Amino acid sequence: MPRIHLALLALSLGLCAACGSYTAPTNSQNPPPPMVQANDVSIVVGASGLTTTAFSPNPKVVSLGGSPSVTVRWVNKDITGGDYTSGSATVHNITSDNGTFTASGNLGGNATYSVALTTTGDYHYHCSIHPNMVGTITVNP
């Protein structure tokens, strides 16, 4: 009898170990869409052919609210021909009009870019790839 118990124990441990080693497949080419945050600005579908409506909302109004900075995040939602896993994304590059913040670099589909703004006022920006795309962030106290 003890041999049967040992064999069953070994079999059970082997099955548990095998079940615990599964790794879910991932899709590194198309990350899932990011969760929407309060200070998000979306780059809308078809943005490269638009002007002030390429970013939503535009202008984006945020408040420092007693904090030393407020973070604004752009999300590239300019994906056509499917959803975030099968569609084709247009690349954009968020650039400050006066160099107030560093350019985003190329943002593919669902990519995000965040900037911490520390001073009240208007921050004007555009897409350096599609200069007709323009936007404003207004930071209030």
List where the protein language model places each region:
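Sec-dependent bacterial lipoprotein signal peptides
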Residues: 1-17
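Extracytoplasmic copper-binding redox domains, predominantly the cupredoxin/blue-copper superfamily
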Residues: 19-141
